[in-house]
Amino acid sequence: MVVLQPDPFLSELTSMYERSTEKGSVWVTMKRSSMKCQARLKKMAAKGEAVEYRCLVRATDGKKNICTALSAKEYLKFQASYATVLKAHMHALKKRERKDKKKAAEVEKIPEKAPKKQKKAPSSKKSAGSKS
């Protein structure tokens, strides 16, 4: 996994989104990380120092993995830039219209049926005037 600075990370993320426009996906994960060894964290906590947690941002398109680590101060600037990248590539999130193969086949096979003409039932009236 390649660890990048925030600006190169965003430019690489943009190229990942562009490659996956027609086919594919990009997964982005964010999580809190101390990025320091546990012994060092315990010493800092014992001294009463504030532990600075970093935000770890990872992205992958299934083939290439990139990541960056952000401090709390960098995070707000990064979030604004990241939102701009997402808005620029939202068109890839729209659902594509797909034809259902079964429904299309049924429509082609069954032509529209014309309404059936109803036959008149023979009248049960007897003619009273004719004798033969």
UniProtKB/Swiss-Prot annotation:
Residues 93-132 are annotated as: Disordered. It is found in: Cytoplasm. It holds the Pfam family SRP14. Signal peptide: none annotated. InterPro entries: Signal_recog_particle_SRP14, Signal_recog_particle_SRP9/14. Residues 103-115 have a biased composition (Basic and acidic residues). One of its GO terms (molecular function) is endoplasmic reticulum signal peptide binding. Residues 93-102 have a biased composition (Basic residues). Keywords: Cytoplasm, Ribonucleoprotein, RNA-binding, Signal recognition particle. GO terms for cellular component: signal recognition particle, endoplasmic reticulum targeting. GO terms for biological process: protein targeting to ER; SRP-dependent cotranslational protein targeting to membrane. SUPFAM superfamilies: Signal recognition particle alu RNA binding heterodimer, SRP9/14. Component of the signal recognition particle (SRP) complex, a ribonucleoprotein complex that mediates the cotranslational targeting of secretory and membrane proteins to the endoplasmic reticulum (ER). SRP9 together with SRP14 and the Alu portion of the SRP RNA, constitutes the elongation arrest domain of SRP. The complex of SRP9 and SRP14 is required for SRP RNA binding. Heterodimer with SRP9; binds RNA as heterodimer. Component of a signal recognition particle (SRP) complex that consists of a 7SL RNA molecule of 300 nucleotides and six protein subunits: SRP72, SRP68, SRP54, SRP19, SRP14 and SRP9. Belongs to the SRP14 family. This is Signal recognition particle 14 kDa protein. It comes from Oryza sativa subsp. japonica (Rice). The lineage of its organism: Eukaryota, Viridiplantae, Streptophyta, Embryophyta, Tracheophyta.
